[in-house]
């Protein structure tokens, strides 16, 4: 239910933007089916899997497993896309970034409870794989479609799928009562769904699937540094080392190959 509300707030930002830029939902049946596939693979399915999985494993392990998204994308794109083959430089950069995520989040793996249920681990890994398939699918099947249209159509359809699933997964649906909860959902929807999806689909069009999914490496850095800045959490050597590994990995994986002379 909360994920459905979050996407609803995201639509409040995306629909006016689509209208102002003249982007209407297409009537072509084949294109609509592709957008529906993108909505399920990139939003509805991983949201449901992560929401379920994180009730059974620790947040640190969930962040590490979610960090496998670029690695899955690297493999899938190699076989699906002609212009995104595995190279030693790209593979090394992604592996280095993943090690950085492990270093950042390993402090949360100190207890057996953090590992949780194997099925919870499988759910989050499946979500990461779904994100990878979605990114590659968007690059292969929706290349050239405006990012505003991709974001609006996929979020609209994903929200419809989630609301249809609410009576099955959670009945009666929960309605938030606290103003702070609505404020948090609005913030997550506008920033985490509206702005994030616009940027994400722009990056897929401009950079390609593998390089676009590298943004998942940045999320743990942002969360931990916000903890330092806002919650006065200590700035540790582990945080600095993990950040340096991630930044180095991203720079290595996204650097354009040297021109041949």
Model-predicted segments: where are they?
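Specific transmembrane alpha-helical segments of multi-pass solute transporters/efflux pumps
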Residues: 14-66, 102-103, 189-207
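Hydrophobic/small/kink-forming positions within alpha-helical transmembrane segments
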Residues: 15, 39-44, 48, 71-75, ...
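Membrane-interface helix termini and inter-helical loops of multi-pass transporters
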Residues: 52-56, 105-117, 167-184, 228-237
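C-terminal transmembrane-helix exit sites in multi-pass transporters
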Residues: 15-25, 70-95, 221-240
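Transmembrane alpha-helical segments that form core, pore/gating elements
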Residues: 14, 73-75, 79, 94, ...
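Cytoplasmic-side transmembrane-helix entry/capping segments in multi-pass membrane proteins
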Residues: 30-39, 85-98, 145-154
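Helix-helix packing/entry segments at the starts of transmembrane helices
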Residues: 3-5, 43, 59-68, 136-160, ...
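Hydrophobic transmembrane alpha-helices of multi-pass small-molecule transport proteins
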Residues: 14, 36, 76, 88-108, ...
């Amino acid at each position: 239910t909360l994920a459905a509300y979050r996407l609803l707030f995201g639509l409040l930002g995306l629909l006016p933007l689509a209208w102002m830029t003249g982007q209407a939902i297409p009537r072509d049946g084949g294109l609509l089916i592709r957008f529906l596939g993108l909505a399920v693979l990139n939003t509805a399915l991983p949201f449901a899997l992560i929401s379920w999985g994180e009730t059974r494993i620790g947040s640190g392990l969930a962040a590490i497993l979610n960090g496998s998204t670029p690695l899955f994308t690297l493999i899938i794109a190699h076989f699906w896309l002609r212009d995104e083959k595995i190279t030693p430089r790209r593979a090394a950069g992604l592996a280095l970034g993943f090690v950085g995520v492990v270093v950042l989040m390993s402090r949360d793996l100190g207890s057996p409870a953090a590992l949780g249920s194997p099925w919870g681990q499988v759910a989050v890994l499946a979500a990461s794989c779904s994100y990878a398939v979605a990114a590659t699918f968007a690059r292969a099947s929706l290349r050239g479609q405006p990012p505003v249209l991709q974001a609006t159509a996929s979020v609209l359809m994903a929200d419809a799928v989630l609301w249809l699933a609410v009576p099955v997964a959670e009945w009666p649906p929960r309605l938030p009562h606290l103003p702070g909860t609505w404020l948090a959902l609005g913030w997550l929807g506008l920033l985490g769904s509206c702005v994030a999806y616009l940027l994400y689909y722009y990056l897929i069009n401009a950079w390609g699937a593998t390089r676009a999914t590298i943004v998942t490496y940045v999320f743990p850095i942002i969360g931990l540094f916000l903890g330092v800045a806002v919650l006065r959490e200590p700035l540790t050597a582990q945080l600095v080392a993990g950040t340096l590994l991630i930044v180095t990995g991203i720079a290595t994986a996204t650097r354009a190959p040297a021109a041949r002379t």
